[in-house]
UniProtKB/Swiss-Prot annotation:
Compartments where found: Cytoplasm
Domain of life, per lineage: Bacteria
Organism, scientific name: Lactococcus lactis subsp. lactis (strain IL1403) (Streptococcus lactis)
Name of the featured protein: L-lactate dehydrogenase 3
Residue numbers binding substrate: R95, N127, P128, V129, D130, E155, T156, S157, R158, T236
Major subcellular site: cytoplasm
Catalysed conversion reaction: (S)-lactate + NAD(+) = pyruvate + NADH + H(+)
Pfam families per the UniProt record, alphabetical: Ldh_1_C (PF02866), Ldh_1_N (PF00056)
Similarity remark: Belongs to the LDH/MDH superfamily. LDH family.
Amino acid sequence: MKINNKKVVIVGAGAVGSTYAHNLVVDDLADEIAIINTNKSKASANSLDLLHALPYLNAAPKNIYAADYSDVSDADIVVLSANAPSATFGKNPDRLQLLENKVEMIRDITRKTMDAGFDGIFLVASNPVDVLAQVVAEVSGLPKHRVIGTGTLLETSRMRQIVAEKLQINPKSIHGYVLAEHGKSSFAAWSNVTVGAIPLTTWLKKYPNPEFPTFDEIDQEIREVGLDIFMQKGNTSYGIAASLARLTRAIFRNESVILPVSAYLTGEYGQFDLYTGSPAIIDRTGVRAVLELELTQEEQEKFKASTVLLKENFDSIKEKCTL
C-alpha cells in the first residue's frame, strides 16, 4: 500500500471512535480524518470539536469532517468501532452472547465500504473482535494481512501496567504478551514475560515480593477489569483508542514493530483459518508476519481451548448469517 496523504476513515463516533479520532489529532498521525456515524450530526459535531483543538496542538492542519461511504475509496485505513444496539453488559457477560446482530452490522458496513472501492487496511475494534475481524476478512475478500483486529493489545497493556505497579517499575520495561481471544479465554504467556531482559519468574525468585499476586490472579484481573470500568463509567475508551492509535502509527510509519493483535493464523500454534490474539510484525502492509511464541504445555492447552471456543462461535454465525 502506497501512503501519501494519510487518510483514516472511522466508522462509529461513539466513545471509542471519538477518543481514537482525538488521539490521531494529538499524535499527528493522519492528514485526513473522515467520521461516519448513523447520527451524522454527531459526526459533524465531533469533527468541529477536533478542528477547534488544532490551534493549541503541536500538529499540522487537518481535514476532519463527517463522511459517508463515498469517502472511503481513497482511504488508507478504515477503522470499525461501531457497536450494534444491545442491552448493557449485565453481570459477568460474555462478548460472544450478542454476536449475531453485531455480525450483521459489521457485514453490512464492510459491504458498503468495499462497494465504494476501498483497497486499504481494515482495523477492527468492535467486539467480539476476533470473530468480527474474521467476518470482515471473509466479506471484504481482502488479503488476510490487511484485516487486523485490536486483539489482545489492551489486555497486554493491562498486564504490563499491573506487573509494573507491583514491581514499582516503569511499564515500558515490562515485556510480554497476552494471547488468544479478546475475552474470557485470554491469558498471559507468563513464560515469556520479562522485566528488562530478565524473565519475570527469575526476577521474582531473585527479588522476592510477598505482595506480588499469582499469575492466575493477574490473568483474572486482566479479564475482569474491563467490565469493572464499564460498570462505573458506561464504556471503556482510552485504552482501546490508544491501542488503535498505536496500530495506526505502526502502519503509517512502517515501523515493523511487534504488537499483539488479532491476526489470521495459518498454522501458528497448530491452528489454521481463524483470527485470534498473537504477536505480529506490523508495517505499512498490515500484518507482515504472525509470530509463534514458545509456550509451556499449560499455555498451549489454554491457547487451544480458546481457539476451539472462537471456531465454534464463528461456525455458528456462518450457519445463521449470510456472509
